[in-house]
């Protein structure tokens, strides 16, 4: 996929999935403020989600569908001329006792969390290799991959989030010589629309610091990993220390 000959990528271009709200919207706005071009994707998203600018393009669609990933990449190349980074933020999370999960539940979780990652990351890495100027791929996982919590029955969701951490480390080694970096951010409990109906006190009890993370805390970590030239294969926990053990 070659950019138009008349187009020169003056700024770096980021792709952000799950960009309509919460962490995704926060990181999209942060990149815009820092001078990046951004292609923002979500199932339901419009340009009005972000401040008026010619540096953001919007692609609506399910990232678990390969055609959506292709449209995102084509939009990045045709509009801005390059793909320099990806933030795989789109994700699904729900809990059930392990024995109650169905095949359909697993397909739903893996379709977005794993297949969605693969769909856009494969295309983006191919483009980064053509550009020969490195790149960054960051995904959002969960502190519960390393520190499960009794009573939060998220085993199948953690299969997918743990898989993201595994592929992050593998790809970091596979593409280190090409300067393409792969990292992950593992949040604890974040104040996003996903937790709108959850008890604040319960969420605070899941943090050693007794606090709920803000979206800005996760955004800062993603931006850091995107710009840290010699950091790859890392899982950066932003969870008030929850991954370290019992409290």
Give the positions of each predicted feature.
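Active-site loop of short-chain dehydrogenase/reductase
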Residues: 11-12, 82-84, 128-142, 177-180, ...
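Conserved glycine-rich cofactor-binding loop
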Residues: 20-21
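Conserved glycine-rich Rossmann-like NAD(P)H-binding loop of the short-chain dehydrogenase/reductase
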Residues: 34-49
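Conserved NAD(P)H cofactor-binding loop of Rossmann-fold oxidoreductase domains
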Residues: 89-94, 240-241
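Substrate-binding pocket helix/loop in short-chain dehydrogenase/reductase
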Residues: 97-98, 105-110, 203
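Catalytic loop of short-chain dehydrogenase/reductase
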Residues: 138-163, 168-177
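C-terminal substrate-recognition "lid" of short-chain dehydrogenase/reductases
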Residues: 180, 214-238, 243
